[in-house]
């Protein structure tokens, strides 16, 4: 994979690509950038059996685009981790399978713009399907499918910022968790047609203790079924 750690050595530089390239890695992260200013375009990213995170962006500024598919299989940590970053990130299709933590985890990105423009498919997580609880900024998902989450399907508890989801399907999450967890959130969120089901257990949407004058909306045609609490 592409591993750049300027923090440990105390160096600072920028990284750019002139032609889109792909990264396909086994037993490591496809990208580990910490911290870095970038102007990069990739045609695809793939990580299998990483001991940490499949894709790991920490303290990244600038622009990073993936025009093709980003894949993380069997990562020891998160499938995709974006943290402490203020860049603009554009992804196309996402496939995350059986990570050891969250499928996608976004943390401390109040000035970032993060777009998942294709179809995001996440399955078999130990943690949340998507964790936005400490993200901030603006995050967009075009089409999302989450199955077999080990905690929340989408965790937005205590979140701030603005979030836009297109069509969203959540099929299976931990019985003591929620399909979408907004507990304590102070965020604006718009969802397209959304379907949430969980084999008769769990809470579909948790709006407890949300704060401030914020808007959370779901498109007409959304459905909740096979849960303990709506």
What residue spans do the PLM features occupy?
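Beta-strand-rich solenoid/repeat architectures in extracellular/passenger domains
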Residues: 1, 5-28, 37-53, 61-78, ...
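Extracellular glycan-recognition regions
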Residues: 32, 56, 131
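Residue-level marker of regulatory loop/turn positions in helix-turn-helix DNA-binding domains and
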Residues: 34, 83, 133
């Amino acid at each position: 994979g592409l591993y750049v750690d300027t923090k440990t050595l105390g160096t600072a530089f920028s990284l750019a690509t002139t032609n889109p390239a792909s990264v396909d890695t086994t037993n490591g992260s496809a990208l580990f950038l910490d911290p870095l200013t970038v102007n990069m375009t990739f045609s695809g990213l793939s990580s299998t059996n990483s001991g940490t995170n499949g894709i790991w962006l920490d303290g990244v500024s600038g622009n990073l685009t993936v025009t093709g598919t980003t894949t993380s299989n069997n990562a020891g940590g998160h499938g995709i981790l974006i943290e402490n970053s203020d860049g603009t990130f554009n992804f196309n299709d996402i496939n995350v399978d059986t990570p050891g933590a969250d499928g996608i985890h976004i943390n401390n990105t109040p000035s970032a713009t993060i777009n998942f423009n294709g179809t995001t498919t996440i399955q078999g997580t130990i943690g949340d399907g998507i964790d936005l609880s400490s993200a901030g900024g603006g995050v967009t998902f075009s089409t999302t499918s989450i199955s077999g989450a080990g905690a929340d399907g989408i965790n937005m508890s205590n979140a701030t910022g603005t979030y836009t989801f297109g069509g969203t399907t959540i099929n299976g999450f931990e019985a003591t968790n929620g399909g979408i967890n907004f507990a304590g959130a102070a965020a604006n969120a718009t969802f397209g047609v959304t379907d949430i089901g969980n084999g008769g257990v769990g809470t579909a949407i948790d709006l407890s203790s949300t704060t401030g004058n914020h808007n959370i909306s779901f498109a007409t045609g959304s459905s909740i079924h096979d849960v303990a609490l709506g």
